[in-house]
Amino acid sequence: MALCKQNMLYIILICLLVCFQNCVCQCPNGWTHHSTSCYYFSDNMKNWDTASASCQAHHAELAIIETDEENTFIWSVMTKLGGLFWLDGTDEFSEGQWEWASTNAAFDYSNWYPGEPTNSGGREDCVLTGGGYKTFWNDAPCTDHFKYVCEKTLESPIVG
């Protein structure tokens, strides 16, 4: 009897392993998967605060770029769409101290356009990328209207 139970447990374990081997994490429709995140590239132009709120309405934040590889991925999608895109970066709370607004963490990685950030006119407190800046970043007034990139972690796995 004990041997039968043990064999049954092995069979169940093997079935579970086979099922979860085909486990796929998916992004919502309209979002793009990369690494451990899903990204949404807007085609609407909004100021930085409204763009951030739009991302939050979808349980996401404006994108935080942490590596050169992630930066290159985001740029590769943006070039197909055209335009400038807001990221989550700001120095609104302390001039010259750039941080990711959603985490309050200082930049560990950055890719500023040569000579940037400049804080031109004393009011450039938000980070954008794309357009003529290519993979580079620039600071801009948060009240300007641009497209934006949202980021969220992959949703729970779907077994299939």
Q: Which residues does each predicted region cover?
A:
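Extracellular, disulfide-bonded carbohydrate-recognition/adhesion ectodomains
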Residues: 1-160
